[in-house]
Amino acid sequence: MEVQFENLFAQLSDLQPTSELDCERLKATLVNSCYQYLHCKPSGNYFIPRDHMDALKRLRRNEDIIISKPDKGNGIVLLDKVDYVRKMEQLLSDKTRFLKDNKEKDLTQQVEKAITKLLSSLKQRGIIDNNTYERLRPTGTIVPRLYGLPKTHKPGIPLRPVLDMVNSPYHALAKWLCSRLEPVKKLLSQHCVRDVFEFINTIEGMNLNDCKMFSLDVSSLFTNVPLKETIEFLGEFIEQNSIDVGIPVDDLKSLLFKCTENVQFKFNGGLYRQTDGVAMGSPLGPLLAEVFMAKLENNQLSNAISKCKVYKRYVDDIFVILNKVHDPKTMLETFNKAHANIKYTIEFESLDHLAFLDVSLTRRPDGSIRRTVFRKETWNDQYVHFRSFVPMKQKMNLINCLAERARKICSEDTLADELAFLHQIFLKNGYPKHLIEKGMQPRPASDKMLTVEKKCVYVNLPFKGDALAVFTERRLSSAISQAFFAAKLRVYFTTTPAVRLQHKDKVPSSEASFCVYKFSCSCGTGYIGRTTRRLTQRVREHHPAWIKSGVTKTINSAVVAHLVETNHRVNVQEAFQPIYKVNGRLPKTIKSRILETAEAIAIKLFKPVLCSQKQHIRALQLAWPTSQRSIDNRQITPIAFV
């Protein structure tokens, strides 16, 4: 908790305080608010009954099931583990897409070195600056993990394979490449819509007289994208159109191949490689899929598309309005001949009705289109229950967002029915009638006044009830606005899910990176340190192999010095433990800053003996009192947002 408040104050460092006195008052308020919030117990009004919690614990301990979320929609899905593994291995048995890595060796560190080498070359040639290099250079990453999401809306409940690329060596670079290629994507995507609302604007006022309406679906698009063909086409398009993406085309292609080709991943303890196609979960997946589809649409399919009155695509879902003189089945045959990798399926109107994305479209007798919100058959009337332990703001935002969504999707003759339906659904989910009516009111358009823009500073706190949340937010906002006129506070409250999903391979604590760790000797002497690399690498420096042989070599660690001087022996796995881990989804520069702060706070609070001579400890801005409590008994919450 202290890390959050220390980091909050650090975000104000580039602003001018109103006075030194107000700044010191703010510091005192932050320390006081931190410990007041830390010691407050969560409100008991929303607690899950004990028998319910016991049942959830039994589910978590049951090794014969997989706890997952559905591929689409809300809810929890319980899967038989044997059946889940069988379905996933059946997907992985496709030799044209996946390959079992028989070496059974995690090559993450080798991938880190290869990407670092490519980035170093770009930096040396002045293509990227040092800040970009440090931000993209992979450190302390883990092998991507594959999991499957059950498609509960389809017969047999097939699984959609998803690759968790967060904190992998490819992730930061892939996101950066996506940002560089966004202008190229916009130029290519003539037929693409960003969301359902852009789609509605496209068909607004359309008439279906003498026309046929149908949809096409691309089967398994991501895994069927031919990487080499797509990346080569992308490079040619950039060169032919003289698009400046800030990086030479040859280097761009090298980086794209490094992030997508032969990616090693883990499933059920085994290591595999994806030999072609892009993975669901990779930041580059949607971009390369979009580039490939645009290639087909602008070349092989351009003549067929030109015959359509409307042709709009969202990723792999396509909506078509075609004049009756043309045959949709002939068009389907043309599409299926466009590329050997890609197959399309077609869905026609049924009783003048067709669903596309979140919209249900109905042909009226006069040819106009009636619109309402579409929900799949598996939808279960479930939203966040009013008794759920989440902030009231989130509940009110849910009502307002769904009402606004209905106003944008529905036509005039269906809007009232949709709003009435939402009203009943929220009543079923425990919401009071007056809050539903309040939340469904249209938000008035706010007149933006021309004022000096303020810097937003952020703090993330575990949610402990609405009363405490409102009080803390008001107190912090008042103190910050008084000390720094140019600052604006944003407080984010997080909740811990009652049921944690269990569909990914667990990451061993020894592979933790960007973490603060503790060393506990058998004599009670302690040490606290930080590492951006994998913990196992840092531990080898604290406890080198030669320490057991009796041969003394160069000592550059307080832990090594202590063990050599005292001749104490420790169990490495028990002696070194991570006590704080920074959220892997944060940018690297922010993670590094938070990590330094977390280490400094831990040393300040617990004063481990072996850290007395430690150098390069981040200077703390707030006056944290020294704690006499054991670090073993202290709850340390990882940062989720900055």
Q: What is each stretch, according to the model?
A:
Residues 1-642:
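Charged structural interfaces that engage phosphate-rich ligands
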